[in-house]
Structure formats: C-alpha cells, structure tokens
A protein has these predicted regions:
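Bacterial Sec-dependent N-terminal signal peptides
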Residues: 1-27, 187, 191
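Outer-membrane beta-barrel translocator domains and adjoining extracellular loop/strand segments
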Residues: 36-42, 79-85, 122-128, 163-170
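Outer-membrane beta-barrel "beta-signal"
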Residues: 177-204
Length: 204
C-alpha cells in the first residue's frame, strides 16, 4: 500500500514543470497531540517538519485557488495524566490540499483541506502502519521579494483510522485514534521564472 501511495505522490510532487509548480517550501514547528481514549488523552507537545510544493498557484484562467502537497515527519503522542507515561509514534506524513487564497499588498491568506496519509516508520505493539485522515489548514504568507516568502500555518489532523490497539483486562481490544494540532513556520522559494501576480486583488 505504501508503494502505491508513494508512486502516486512522488511524481506529483516533483513533476513541477507540467503542473506549473510555483513555490518550494521548507517548514517546521510544534504539534499539540493527544489520543481520543484514556489513559493517553492528555495533550502533549511534539515536533514536525516537512518539504512541500505549492502549484497551479497562478494560471490565466484563475487566480483564487491552488494545490499544495507536502511530505515530512510528524510525531504523534498522548500522555497518561496519572503516570506521566506517553504513547509515542513516529510517522512519515503526506498530504495534498486544495486551497483558496486572497492576496493584498505583499500578504496572502489561504485556507484549504485535503486528504492525508501517515506511515508508521518505527512499528511496535499492535500499532497500525497506515493512518488515513483529513487535514484542514489556514495560513498567512508574507512575500519578502519576488522569490522569497515567509509563512505561518495552523493545521488540524483528524485520523479516520486508529493508530494503536491495546488489549484490555476483559481481553477486548481498545483502539486509539490520534488528534494533532500543528503550528508551523517556514520559508518559501519561487522556482518559476515567470512573474506571479501576488498582488492581483490589491489593484481591484
């Protein structure tokens, strides 16, 4: 399954000429993460980092939406409030989002949503290797020049599949679902030579 996902995602990620890719992004930040079930339902802070592309950012037939894909690392966790122990999981994170944008002067606001897939890179116990979910996100970009930009994003990861299963005293399995709230900052570099009209709306 992972090979199928990578075969679809990687050509999309790197084939920027055909998809009119515009901005290469590098980001990192913190992740407020918790499980949906006791005893690991107390939030704790971990970290995340990713490499991404924004593409279809500017076309002749539209100037209000674009696509964004990322591949990176995310640490999911949850804390036992009584014992202080944590349930930690390391994942390779992939997502592709459909985003709408509004630009004014040298700022751009965006909001988007799309599917995400996490692959457990260090497996133990009865954990699931693949976690499917959705990722809504909002962001703000500030353009330092025609090529360089800084941006800040807030994203929420909602898992549709469990990340861990544990045997209970009655021999039944409890499945844990993870929730993550990500706060990231990053830098973007425009790779296309064609000038992008970031300030299209400022002249309206």
């Amino acid at each position: 399954m992972l090979r199928i996902i990578l075969c679809v995602f990687i050509p999309l990620f790197f084939n920027h000429n055909n998809l009119s890719s515009q901005i290469l992004k590098l980001s990192g930040g913190i992740n407020r993460t918790w499980m949906n079930e006791k005893p690991f339902d107390t939030p704790c802070l971990t970290y995340t980092g990713s490499l991404g592309y924004d593409y279809l950012l500017y076309r002749d037939y539209h100037d209000w939406f674009y696509l964004s894909s990322e591949i990176g690392y995310i640490k999911r966790s949850g804390k036992n409030a009584i014992t202080g122990s944590k349930l930690n999981m390391d994942h390779l994170h992939l997502n592709t989002l459909f985003k709408v944008k509004y630009s004014f002067e040298n700022l751009m606001m965006s909001a988007g949503v799309g599917p995400s897939v996490d692959y457990r890179v260090i497996k133990g116990g009865q954990s699931n290797k693949l976690v499917f979910g959705a990722r809504p996100e909002i962001g703000l970009s500030y353009f330092l020049s025609n090529r360089i930009s800084l941006y800040f994003t807030v994203a929420y990861l909602k898992g549709f599949s469990g990340v861990e299963s544990m045997m209970q005293a009655d021999s039944s399995d409890k499945t844990f679902y993870n929730n993550s709230l990500l706060f990231t900052i990053g830098i973007g570099y425009r790779v296309k030579k064609k000038k992008i009209n970031y300030w299209h709306y400022s002249s309206l």
